[in-house]
């Protein structure tokens, strides 16, 4: 199933043809943002989801061959995503939504650093670092968006790049403040039933109840 979802995206993006071939349908309730946010949302969330799977070692099984193929496509796709001359250069510098979806890309690097970040060439790495740092232009509201900002800064720290520790600490402190019990966190001051806790929290030996 993961391969069936990922292959159409990565096979096209690896050739710089995702925007050309991806069919985008707009909801009747679309809020008017640029449709180009769709491509980063698609790529970022896909890669964050399959990164742990792609981090598994290669083997000669059918699944192993699929992972290897996806990983090869993914590395080429990552390069297109930050290459200003590529048709698949993503929407990094407009709108506010890129803060959210770039965090998923950063998450994919954190989840499979050796497989998805380290093999990238130095030019591509520096482009990612620059794009991530430029997202500081976005002042996140006091909601779960603080966590997206912190995810990006956490990756920059992991990559030995200049990072903003205040953004990380602020997100962690606000998340602790917004804990409402029984494993749930509010989305800012307003409680909401959503899945963010599954994305941003993990079991901790120090606090099993909140995890």
Spans of model-derived segments:
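Secondary-structure boundary/capping residues
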Residues: 184, 210-211
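Ser/Thr/Asn(+Pro)-rich, low-complexity disordered segments
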Residues: 1-199
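Conserved small/polar residues in nucleotide/adenosyl-binding loops
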Residues: 200-209
């Amino acid at each position: 199933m993961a391969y069936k979802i990922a292959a159409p995206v990565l096979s096209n993006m690896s050739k710089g043809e995702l925007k050309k071939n991806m069919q985008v349908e707009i909801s009747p309730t679309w809020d008017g943002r640029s449709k180009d946010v769709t491509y980063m949302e698609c790529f970022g969330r896909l890669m964050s989801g399959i990164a742990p799977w792609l981090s598994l070692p290669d083997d000669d099984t059918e699944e192993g061959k699929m992972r290897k193929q996806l990983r090869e496509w993914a590395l080429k796709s990552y390069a297109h995503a930050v290459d200003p001359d590529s048709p698949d250069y993503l929407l990094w510098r407009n709108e506010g939504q890129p803060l959210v979806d770039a965090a998923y890309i950063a998450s994919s690097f954190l989840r499979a650093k050796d497989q998805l970040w380290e093999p990238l060439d130095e030019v591509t790495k520096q482009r990612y670092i620059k794009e991530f740092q430029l997202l500081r232009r976005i002042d996140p509201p006091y909601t779960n968006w603080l966590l997206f900002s912190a995810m990006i800064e956490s990756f920059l720290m992991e990559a030995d790049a200049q990072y903003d520790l205040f953004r990380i600490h602020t997100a962690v402190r606000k998340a602790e403040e917004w804990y409402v019990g029984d494993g749930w966190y509010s989305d800012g001051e307003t409680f909401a039933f959503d899945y963010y806790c599954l994305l941003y929290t993990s079991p901790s030996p120090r606090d099993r109840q909140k995890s």
